[in-house]
Protein backbone atom coordinates (compact mmCIF):
# COMPACT_ATOMS: atom_id res chain seq x y z
CA UNK A 1 0.00 0.00 0.00
CA UNK A 2 1.34 3.43 -0.96
CA UNK A 3 2.57 5.79 1.70
CA UNK A 4 0.33 8.56 2.95
CA UNK A 5 0.59 11.74 0.88
CA UNK A 6 -1.14 15.10 0.94
CA UNK A 7 -4.62 14.35 -0.39
CA UNK A 8 -6.59 17.30 -1.76
CA UNK A 9 -9.15 15.80 -4.15
CA UNK A 10 -11.36 12.72 -4.38
CA UNK A 11 -12.79 11.62 -7.72
CA UNK A 12 -15.81 9.34 -7.44
CA UNK A 13 -17.38 7.16 -10.13
CA UNK A 14 -21.18 7.12 -10.11
CA UNK A 15 -22.87 4.07 -11.67
CA UNK A 16 -21.82 0.96 -9.79
CA UNK A 17 -20.06 2.96 -7.08
CA UNK A 18 -22.70 5.28 -5.61
CA UNK A 19 -25.75 3.74 -7.26
CA UNK A 20 -26.98 0.96 -9.55
CA UNK A 21 -29.73 2.40 -11.74
CA UNK A 22 -32.34 3.77 -9.29
CA UNK A 23 -30.94 2.16 -6.13
CA UNK A 24 -28.19 3.63 -4.00
CA UNK A 25 -25.30 1.50 -2.80
CA UNK A 26 -26.10 0.85 0.90
CA UNK A 27 -24.63 3.56 3.11
CA UNK A 28 -23.34 5.66 0.21
CA UNK A 29 -25.30 8.83 1.04
CA UNK A 30 -24.06 8.93 4.62
CA UNK A 31 -20.50 8.13 3.52
CA UNK A 32 -20.58 11.06 1.09
CA UNK A 33 -21.70 13.35 3.90
CA UNK A 34 -18.76 12.18 6.01
CA UNK A 35 -16.36 12.76 3.12
CA UNK A 36 -17.74 16.28 2.66
CA UNK A 37 -16.80 16.97 6.26
CA UNK A 38 -13.14 16.57 5.34
CA UNK A 39 -10.98 19.24 3.71
CA UNK A 40 -11.01 17.72 0.21
CA UNK A 41 -12.47 18.71 -3.15
CA UNK A 42 -14.91 16.14 -4.55
CA UNK A 43 -15.61 15.54 -8.23
CA UNK A 44 -17.98 12.95 -9.66
CA UNK A 45 -16.71 11.44 -12.91
CA UNK A 46 -18.76 9.18 -15.10
CA UNK A 47 -18.74 7.49 -18.49
CA UNK A 48 -22.52 7.30 -18.60
CA UNK A 49 -24.01 8.03 -22.01
CA UNK A 50 -27.56 6.93 -21.21
CA UNK A 51 -28.78 10.30 -19.96
CA UNK A 52 -27.90 13.99 -19.92
CA UNK A 53 -26.04 15.56 -17.03
CA UNK A 54 -29.26 17.22 -15.84
CA UNK A 55 -31.18 13.92 -15.85
CA UNK A 56 -28.30 12.25 -14.04
CA UNK A 57 -28.29 14.97 -11.41
CA UNK A 58 -32.04 14.59 -10.87
CA UNK A 59 -31.62 10.82 -10.47
CA UNK A 60 -28.89 11.31 -7.85
CA UNK A 61 -30.90 13.89 -5.94
CA UNK A 62 -33.92 11.57 -5.85
CA UNK A 63 -31.60 9.06 -4.20
CA UNK A 64 -30.78 11.79 -1.63
CA UNK A 65 -27.19 12.40 -2.71
CA UNK A 66 -25.98 15.93 -1.94
CA UNK A 67 -24.37 16.75 -5.30
CA UNK A 68 -24.25 19.94 -7.39
CA UNK A 69 -24.12 20.06 -11.18
CA UNK A 70 -20.71 21.74 -11.31
CA UNK A 71 -19.21 18.81 -9.41
CA UNK A 72 -20.10 16.33 -12.18
CA UNK A 73 -17.75 15.71 -15.12
CA UNK A 74 -19.08 13.33 -17.75
CA UNK A 75 -17.70 11.70 -20.87
CA UNK A 76 -20.52 13.45 -22.75
CA UNK A 77 -18.99 16.77 -21.69
CA UNK A 78 -15.61 15.62 -22.95
CA UNK A 79 -17.12 14.44 -26.25
CA UNK A 80 -18.89 17.75 -26.86
CA UNK A 81 -15.65 19.65 -26.22
CA UNK A 82 -13.85 17.51 -28.79
CA UNK A 83 -16.59 18.03 -31.38
CA UNK A 84 -16.41 21.78 -30.91
CA UNK A 85 -12.62 21.77 -31.27
CA UNK A 86 -12.74 19.62 -34.41
CA UNK A 87 -15.74 21.53 -35.83
CA UNK A 88 -17.34 18.37 -37.24
CA UNK A 89 -20.96 17.34 -37.74
CA UNK A 90 -21.53 14.08 -35.88
CA UNK A 91 -23.80 11.14 -36.45
CA UNK A 92 -24.76 10.73 -32.79
CA UNK A 93 -25.11 7.10 -31.71
CA UNK A 94 -26.15 7.92 -28.16
CA UNK A 95 -29.26 7.35 -26.10
CA UNK A 96 -31.98 9.90 -26.87
CA UNK A 97 -31.91 10.97 -23.22
CA UNK A 98 -28.29 12.12 -23.70
CA UNK A 99 -29.07 14.40 -26.66
CA UNK A 100 -29.64 17.56 -24.55
CA UNK A 101 -25.90 17.59 -23.79
CA UNK A 102 -25.28 18.06 -27.54
CA UNK A 103 -27.79 20.88 -28.02
CA UNK A 104 -26.55 23.33 -30.64
CA UNK A 105 -24.18 20.86 -32.30
CA UNK A 106 -24.87 20.65 -36.06
CA UNK A 107 -25.72 17.06 -37.05
CA UNK A 108 -27.08 17.38 -40.60
CA UNK A 109 -24.93 15.88 -43.36
CA UNK A 110 -22.64 14.19 -40.80
CA UNK A 111 -18.90 13.86 -41.34
CA UNK A 112 -18.04 12.15 -38.04
CA UNK A 113 -19.41 9.27 -35.96
CA UNK A 114 -19.86 9.58 -32.20
CA UNK A 115 -20.62 6.37 -30.36
CA UNK A 116 -21.88 5.96 -26.82
CA UNK A 117 -24.22 3.43 -25.25
CA UNK A 118 -27.32 3.40 -27.44
CA UNK A 119 -28.98 -0.04 -27.44
CA UNK A 120 -31.99 1.22 -29.42
CA UNK A 121 -29.68 2.35 -32.23
CA UNK A 122 -27.33 -0.64 -32.35
CA UNK A 123 -28.96 -2.52 -35.20
CA UNK A 124 -27.68 -3.38 -38.66
CA UNK A 125 -29.13 -0.48 -40.64
CA UNK A 126 -27.83 2.24 -38.31
CA UNK A 127 -24.44 0.60 -37.79
CA UNK A 128 -24.09 0.21 -41.54
CA UNK A 129 -24.68 3.94 -42.00
CA UNK A 130 -21.87 4.60 -39.54
CA UNK A 131 -19.70 2.03 -41.32
CA UNK A 132 -20.12 3.84 -44.66
CA UNK A 133 -19.32 7.23 -43.15
CA UNK A 134 -16.12 5.83 -41.69
CA UNK A 135 -15.15 4.30 -45.03
CA UNK A 136 -15.53 7.78 -46.54
CA UNK A 137 -13.00 9.13 -44.04
CA UNK A 138 -15.17 10.30 -41.15
CA UNK A 139 -13.43 10.06 -37.75
CA UNK A 140 -14.80 7.62 -35.16
CA UNK A 141 -15.18 9.15 -31.70
CA UNK A 142 -15.95 6.77 -28.84
CA UNK A 143 -17.39 8.38 -25.75
CA UNK A 144 -15.90 5.38 -23.98
CA UNK A 145 -15.10 1.72 -24.67
CA UNK A 146 -16.37 -0.04 -21.56
CA UNK A 147 -16.91 -3.75 -22.17
CA UNK A 148 -19.90 -4.03 -19.87
CA UNK A 149 -21.73 -2.32 -17.02
CA UNK A 150 -24.01 -3.32 -14.15
CA UNK A 151 -27.81 -3.22 -14.32
CA UNK A 152 -30.31 -4.46 -11.74
CA UNK A 153 -30.85 -7.61 -13.80
CA UNK A 154 -27.12 -8.35 -14.20
CA UNK A 155 -24.19 -7.33 -16.40
CA UNK A 156 -24.94 -5.80 -19.81
CA UNK A 157 -22.85 -5.02 -22.88
CA UNK A 158 -21.28 -1.58 -22.95
CA UNK A 159 -20.39 0.42 -26.08
CA UNK A 160 -16.88 -1.02 -26.30
CA UNK A 161 -17.77 -4.16 -28.30
CA UNK A 162 -19.71 -2.09 -30.84
CA UNK A 163 -16.93 0.48 -31.20
CA UNK A 164 -14.44 -2.34 -31.70
CA UNK A 165 -16.66 -3.91 -34.37
CA UNK A 166 -16.61 -0.68 -36.40
CA UNK A 167 -12.87 -0.32 -35.87
CA UNK A 168 -12.35 -3.84 -37.19
CA UNK A 169 -14.70 -3.42 -40.15
CA UNK A 170 -13.15 -0.14 -41.30
CA UNK A 171 -9.52 -0.70 -40.27
CA UNK A 172 -9.58 2.53 -38.28
CA UNK A 173 -8.96 3.51 -34.67
CA UNK A 174 -11.43 5.40 -32.54
CA UNK A 175 -10.55 8.49 -30.55
CA UNK A 176 -11.72 7.70 -27.00
CA UNK A 177 -12.67 10.63 -24.76
CA UNK A 178 -13.94 9.04 -21.53
CA UNK A 179 -12.27 6.95 -18.86
CA UNK A 180 -9.59 5.50 -18.87
CA UNK A 181 -8.07 8.20 -21.11
CA UNK A 182 -5.50 10.40 -19.37
CA UNK A 183 -7.02 13.58 -20.78
CA UNK A 184 -10.36 12.73 -19.16
CA UNK A 185 -8.88 12.58 -15.66
CA UNK A 186 -6.77 15.70 -16.20
CA UNK A 187 -9.82 17.63 -17.45
CA UNK A 188 -11.81 16.43 -14.44
CA UNK A 189 -9.12 17.87 -12.16
CA UNK A 190 -8.93 21.15 -14.08
CA UNK A 191 -10.12 23.98 -11.88
CA UNK A 192 -9.51 22.12 -8.62
CA UNK A 193 -5.94 23.39 -8.28
CA UNK A 194 -4.86 19.81 -7.58
CA UNK A 195 -2.19 17.70 -9.21
CA UNK A 196 -2.91 14.01 -9.95
CA UNK A 197 -0.52 13.02 -7.16
CA UNK A 198 -2.81 14.85 -4.74
CA UNK A 199 -5.95 12.94 -5.78
CA UNK A 200 -7.58 9.54 -5.32
CA UNK A 201 -10.13 7.85 -7.59
CA UNK A 202 -12.86 5.51 -6.30
CA UNK A 203 -14.64 3.22 -8.76
CA UNK A 204 -15.95 -0.25 -9.60
CA UNK A 205 -14.09 -0.68 -12.91
CA UNK A 206 -10.54 -1.93 -12.45
CA UNK A 207 -9.37 -0.75 -15.88
CA UNK A 208 -11.36 2.38 -16.65
CA UNK A 209 -11.60 3.85 -13.13
CA UNK A 210 -8.61 2.57 -11.21
CA UNK A 211 -6.12 1.75 -13.95
CA UNK A 212 -6.80 4.99 -15.81
CA UNK A 213 -6.44 7.11 -12.68
CA UNK A 214 -3.25 5.40 -11.58
CA UNK A 215 -1.76 5.91 -15.05
CA UNK A 216 -1.86 9.67 -14.49
CA UNK A 217 -0.44 9.46 -10.97
CA UNK A 218 -3.52 9.24 -8.75
CA UNK A 219 -4.22 6.59 -6.16
CA UNK A 220 -6.93 4.15 -7.21
CA UNK A 221 -9.46 2.49 -4.91
CA UNK A 222 -11.47 -0.40 -6.37
CA UNK A 223 -14.85 -1.17 -4.79
CA UNK A 224 -16.52 -4.59 -4.97
CA UNK A 225 -19.90 -3.26 -6.06
CA UNK A 226 -21.41 -2.63 -9.50
CA UNK A 227 -19.54 -4.39 -12.30
CA UNK A 228 -16.79 -5.72 -10.01
CA UNK A 229 -16.05 -9.41 -10.47
CA UNK A 230 -13.84 -11.66 -8.35
CA UNK A 231 -10.10 -11.12 -8.94
CA UNK A 232 -10.60 -7.94 -11.01
CA UNK A 233 -7.86 -6.36 -8.91
CA UNK A 234 -5.38 -8.81 -10.45
CA UNK A 235 -6.10 -7.61 -14.00
CA UNK A 236 -4.13 -4.36 -13.88
CA UNK A 237 -0.50 -3.57 -13.18
CA UNK A 238 0.21 -1.89 -10.87
CA UNK A 239 -2.69 -3.28 -8.84
CA UNK A 240 -5.14 -0.93 -7.11
CA UNK A 241 -3.80 1.04 -4.18
CA UNK A 242 -6.71 -0.49 -2.26
CA UNK A 243 -9.56 -2.92 -2.93
CA UNK A 244 -12.49 -2.71 -0.51
CA UNK A 245 -16.10 -3.78 -0.18
CA UNK A 246 -17.92 -0.56 -1.09
CA UNK A 247 -17.85 3.23 -1.23
CA UNK A 248 -18.44 3.63 2.53
CA UNK A 249 -15.39 1.45 3.20
CA UNK A 250 -13.34 3.53 0.77
CA UNK A 251 -14.37 6.70 2.59
CA UNK A 252 -13.44 5.12 5.93
CA UNK A 253 -9.96 4.40 4.61
CA UNK A 254 -9.50 7.90 3.20
CA UNK A 255 -10.55 9.56 6.45
CA UNK A 256 -8.40 7.28 8.58
CA UNK A 257 -5.26 6.94 6.46
CA UNK A 258 -5.01 9.60 3.75
CA UNK A 259 -5.92 12.81 5.57
UniProtKB/Swiss-Prot annotation:
The modification N6-succinyllysine is found at residue 50. SUPFAM superfamilies: HAD-like. The keyword Metal-binding applies. Mg(2+) binds at residues 13, 15, 204. Residues 47-71 form a coiled coil. One of its GO terms (molecular function) is metal ion binding. Its cofactor is Mg(2+). Substrate binds at residues 13-15, 46-47, 179. Binds 1 Mg(2+) ion per subunit. GO terms for cellular component: cytoplasm; extracellular exosome. Keywords: Coiled coil, Magnesium, Metal-binding. NCBIfam families: HAD-SF-IIA, HAD-SF-IIA-hyp3. Belongs to the HAD-like hydrolase superfamily. This is Haloacid dehalogenase-like hydrolase domain-containing protein 2. It comes from Homo sapiens (Human).
